[in-house]
Amino acid sequence: MIIIPAIDLFDNCAVRLFKGNYKEKKIYSSEPWKLAEGFAKNGATLLHLVDLNGARNQLGINEDSILKIRKTTSLKVQLGGGIRDKEKLAYYDKIGIDRFILGTAAVTDPDLLKFALDNYEKERVVVAVDAIDGIVKIAGWEKDSGVRYRDLMDRLAKAGIEHIVFTDIAQDGTLAGPNLKAYQEILNSYPFQVIASGGISSLKDLMDLSSLKTKIPLYGVITGKALYEGKLDLAKAISSI
């Protein structure tokens, strides 16, 4: 299980939201590329980067920060937020993004999902399944898709998706701990390589996730707020798991 630090970009700053609420955001840095450099120095290998403006269809706002992060860090980068057409996929491929995260498009545009799988290595195509009360949210978590996350996962498995990020939005940004039951059910029901996201507050949370008794081990865990608030030491977490 790998530990994946997160940077969420809003107006070119690193921020964290509380339960996905844009009205409850806290700014942590106006130089997010420096955060990425720090994560690399502390032993991380993969960065979870989210374009929050892009997720709301406010495209291009964070482009400079995304480029600078890609150019200045040795980390592999998985990027999501606003990837809803072939041109965006091609652009991110061109600038060296390692993995593309499709969220809204995975729900609303199965043809784009198929295109991504047909034209890029499966390892590079990740689907974000973001849910609250069992229902998938889209468009920056601001719209209800009406699709249950288990139904979406059934579709993704049939489509050939191998990698997903699952976020329990009710836990995200709360430091209240992960939804262990949900991850256990997913890992025992589906063939995906799963990355957990939402609620991480301590090394104990990471240990609890790594100790889940499942058919497939958890691939990774995303953590953001716990790092920024000093609740979790990244280097220690990486060496302990």
From Swiss-Prot:
Any Gene Ontology biological process: L-histidine biosynthetic process
Main localization category: cytoplasm
CDD domains named in the record: HisA (cd04732)
Name of the protein in question: 1-(5-phosphoribosyl)-5-[(5-phosphoribosylamino)methylideneamino] imidazole-4-carboxamide isomerase
Active site: residue positions: D8 (proton acceptor), D130 (proton donor)
SUPFAM superfamilies hit by this protein: Ribulose-phoshate binding barrel (SSF51366)
Lineage per the UniProt record: Bacteria, Pseudomonadati, Spirochaetota, Spirochaetia, Leptospirales
Molecular function GO terms recorded: 1-(5-phosphoribosyl)-5-[(5-phosphoribosylamino)methylideneamino]imidazole-4-carboxamide isomerase activity
Pfam families per record: His_biosynth
NCBIfam families given in the database record: 1-(5-phosphoribosyl)-5-[(5-phosphoribosylamino)methylideneamino]imidazole-4-carboxamide isomerase (TIGR00007)
Encoding gene, per UniProt annotation: hisA
Protein localization: Cytoplasm
Organism whose genome encodes this protein: Leptospira borgpetersenii serovar Hardjo-bovis (strain L550)
